[in-house]
C-alpha cells in the first residue's frame, strides 16, 4: 500500500508541491522514546527517483559518517521536513516565489478594492504536522541543515552559529522534550570537504549525548567576589582565562559591564556596570580594590592571560578604560586560526569541536546573548561560560597547533595582532603598508609567549 502523507497529518491538498512524487520517511518507529531520528530538508533527484531518503551522493556521505560516529542508519528514522522535491532542489527559491505571489495578490486586491485572497501556503507549513506526528516517539534528533533545525527548534540563528551545540527543546502538550543536535547538511559537506571532519565530529558528539556519555560539567561560578577572595584565586594558577563584557562594540569607547576570570572548572565574575547603565555591584571602595586586583593580574608577567580575541578587543578596552595593557596573552582565536585557517574562528565554533558545551552564544531568535541578554544575571552567566570554555579549548588547541607544526605561524599572527591593536589604539585604520613592513620584521625573529 502506498504511503499517504495525509494519513500522518500533511495538508497535501493545499501544498504548492501537490502532485509531486512523495519520498516517504524510512525506518522503524521506536516507541521506547530512546531512538534517533535524522531530519533533512527535502529529497533530491536520486531520492525522488528511488523514493527513499538520502540515497544519492549526500546519502552515501551520511551513511559513511554515521558509521564513523557509531550510529547505525537502520536503527534510526530518516526523514525530511518536506517529502517532495522542490524544483531544482531549491527550496529557498520556491519560498521566495510564494512570498512574491502573496504580496502581489494583496497589492492587486487593495488596488482594486477586492477581498484579499487566501495566501498560497508554504510547503513547510503543509508538511509540518506530518513531521511532528512521525517524530512524536523520538526524543533524540539530529537536524541536517538550517531548514530542519528551524523546524525542530524554532531557532532563527544561522546553522553555522549553532551547529555542534547541544540543544534541549522543551516538551509541549503533544511532543516530548527533545535532545537536538544541529549540524550541516551532508550535501554541504560534499561541496566543502574541509567540513567533513566537523560533520563527523557533530554526529559522534550526538551519539555520545544520546547515550548519556557526554562530559560537559558547567563551571563553579562565584559572582562579585571581594578583593581578597579574588586575589587569592588569581595567585594559584600559571595561566587564567579571561573575558570582558561591554556596553558596546567599539573598544575605544565601550564601558566594562563585567570581567570574568577563571579556569576550566571555576570562574569568578566581577560586575561593574549594570545593563541599566547606572547600577554598580560593589561599594565604591570595594570596586576600587577589586579593580586594582584585576589590573595587577592583567599586568603580571608570571601569569598568562588566555582569551578569545583577547589580544585585540579586550586589550583595547582595558587600555582605554583602565589604562593597563594585559601581558602576556595567548589568544585562542589566533591559535585556532593557526591550526585551521580555512574554517571559522568564533568561540562557538571552536567550542563545538573541542568541548561538549551546549549552545550558548545566541538565543533562538538569532540574537547574540552578549548584546541582548535579558538581565545582568543572564549576561554574567554567559560571561562565565565564555571563560570556562576558553580555558577548556586551550590545551587541545595547543596540541592542534603543535600537531600541524604551526607554532611559528601562531607567533607571527599574534605579533601582527599586537601591531594592529597599536594602530587601532591611536585611532588609525590599519595601515596595510606598515602592517606588511612589521610582518617582514617579525619574520626575521621569533616571538615567544609561553
Locate each region found by the language model.
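Short strand-coil-strand connectors
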Residues: 170-176, 262-264, 426
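Metal-dependent phosphoesterase core characteristic of DEDDh/y 3'-5' exonuclease domains
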Residues: 62, 153-165, 177-190, 262-264, ...
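A polyanion-binding, active-site-adjacent surface
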Residues: 1-213
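Mixed-charge, glycine-rich, non-catalytic linkers/tails in nucleic-acid processing enzymes
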Residues: 214-219, 326-335, 367-450
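Short beta-strand-alpha-helix junction that forms the catalytic/metal-binding core
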Residues: 35, 181-185, 268, 304, ...
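A residue-level signal for conserved active-site and pocket-lining positions in enzyme catalytic cores
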Residues: 9, 141, 206, 243, ...
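Active-site flanking residues adjacent to catalytic metal/cofactor-binding acidic residues
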Residues: 39, 79, 184, 242, ...
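Conserved RNase H-like, two-metal-ion catalytic cores of nucleic-acid enzymes
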Residues: 46-47, 51-55, 62, 69, ...
